[in-house]
């Protein structure tokens, strides 16, 4: 497999009243297509900043970011947004569903920014990914009518709807109880087994062990890169009744 993502000496600084705060220091990293990677470390170590750069929500101060063989380091905000909408799927800790849109409408939202796709095609694609996360029976419901676990599965469907090259998940189980967290992690196992590339930020060591590879950050630096040769085996997909969550 070829490298889907390659970071070369990536640094990121923020400036407040001309005072520089360096959040990332010389990150070198390669993620191969089809890998499941966990990004770990204490709060404030730079995990979310790195994920923002990977997701093209921000640009590095220094270094090169190669995504799908394209150097995206120096692109404008609009250029980054265009690539992001096609190649990257996000799953956030707080779900980030729009309260006055239905489940189906929330999932279709990323498709609405693409030209040349009809509403009928958007509906069909939304139905397809909602079936994948076992939420197709809730298409007409609103977020307030769903449990936390159900909302996060809708958020995963939204991340999948564009057939992204990579799924970036920032503490996807952070707002969930243990049962719902396990259901979401099991869903990630399933998606990875189907070929998805996933990079997940997590504080939970057990969650990190489900990934093939664990990256550890400390003070803005990548200090560990471990292959999880004895990673936890994925829970059987029928071991949890997702519809009950």
Predicted regions mapped to residue ranges:
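Conserved beta-strand-loop-alpha-helix hinge in the C-terminal portion
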Residues: 221-245
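ABC family nucleotide-binding domain
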Residues: 3-217
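C-terminal end-of-chain micro-motif
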Residues: 1, 37, 242-245
């Amino acid at each position: 497999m070829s490298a889907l993502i390659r970071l070369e000496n990536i640094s990121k600084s923020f400036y407040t009243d001309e005072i520089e705060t360096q959040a990332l220091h010389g990150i070198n990293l390669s993620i191969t297509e089809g890998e499941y990677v966990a990004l770990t470390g204490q709060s404030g170590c730079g995990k979310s900043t790195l994920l923002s750069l990977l997701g093209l929500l921000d640009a590095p101060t220094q270094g090169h970011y190669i995504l799908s063989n394209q150097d995206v380091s120096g692109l404008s905000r609009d250029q980054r947004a265009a690539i992001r909408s096609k190649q990257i799927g996000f799953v956030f800790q707080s779900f980030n569903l729009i309260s006055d849109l239905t489940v189906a409408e929330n999932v279709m939202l990323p498709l609405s920014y693409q030209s040349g796709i009809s509403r009928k095609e958007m509906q069909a694609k939304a139905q397809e990914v909602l079936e994948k996360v076992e939420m197709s029976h809730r298409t007409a419901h609103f977020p307030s009518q769903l449990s936390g676990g159900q909302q996060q599965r809708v958020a995963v469907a939204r991340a999948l709807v564009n057939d992204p090259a990579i799924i970036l998940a920032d503490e996807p189980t952070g707002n969930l109880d243990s049962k719902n967290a396990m259901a979401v992690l099991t869903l990630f196992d399933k998606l990875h087994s189907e070929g998805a590339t996933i990079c997940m930020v997590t504080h939970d060591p057990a969650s990190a062990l489900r990934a093939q590879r664990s990256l550890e950050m400390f003070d803005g630096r990548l200090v560990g890169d471990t292959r999880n040769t004895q990673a936890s085996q994925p829970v059987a997909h029928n071991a949890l009744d997702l519809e009950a969550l």
